[in-house]
Design a protein with these regions (language model features):
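Catalytic phosphate/metal-binding cores of nucleic-acid and nucleotide-processing enzymes, i.e., regions
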Residues: 1-151
Length: 151
């Protein structure tokens, strides 16, 4: 897909992030297992009903990286753009996945997602994510009300 003329949004940021992942599989072989969960999007009623019967669940994050690193058993990324905020169901999913050992975050750009994944991949032993490698251009904070890292 040529993104040159596409309006920038959550989908374009996610496409750019996944393109980066595919391009860096030689450097980080575990990236071959990162994938998008197609829960969102506009669908007609018939398709939505079929997907619901197939197990689509509201709130499940956009991206799953089922590779253990540091003290975590896997990683979930919820992509957002602009002023969009995660839904109640999305926040609930992220908090519950954190409780069972996943690293979870909300990223507002492809760059933020790349930095988070790079830090995650490079964790050693039982290290935790700190956001220390994100640099000055990106802010890493745990949202007070949500209790989830926002990058």
């Amino acid at each position: 897909m040529n993104l040159r003329y596409k309006k920038k949004g959550e989908d374009t940021e996610q496409i750019l992030f996944m393109q980066w992942c595919r391009h860096h599989e030689d450097m980080y072989p575990q990236l071959r297992w990162i994938y998008h969960i197609p829960n969102g999007g506009r669908r007609d009623a018939k398709e939505a009903a079929v997907l619901k019967q197939m197990g689509v669940k509201a709130g499940v994050s956009d991206i799953h990286f089922p590779y253990p690193s540091g003290r975590y058993i896997g990683m979930y990324i919820e992509m957002k753009f602009g002023t969009n905020i995660p839904s109640k169901e999305q926040r609930e999913f992220l908090r519950e996945m954190e409780l069972v050992g996943h690293y979870c975050c909300i990223c507002y750009s492809a760059v933020a997602a790349v930095k988070a994944v790079e830090e995650y991949i490079n964790l050693s032993g039982d290290a935790e994510m700190t956001g220390a490698t994100l640099g000055e251009s990106l802010q890493y904070q745990v949202h007070r009300a949500w209790g989830i890292p926002v990058i």
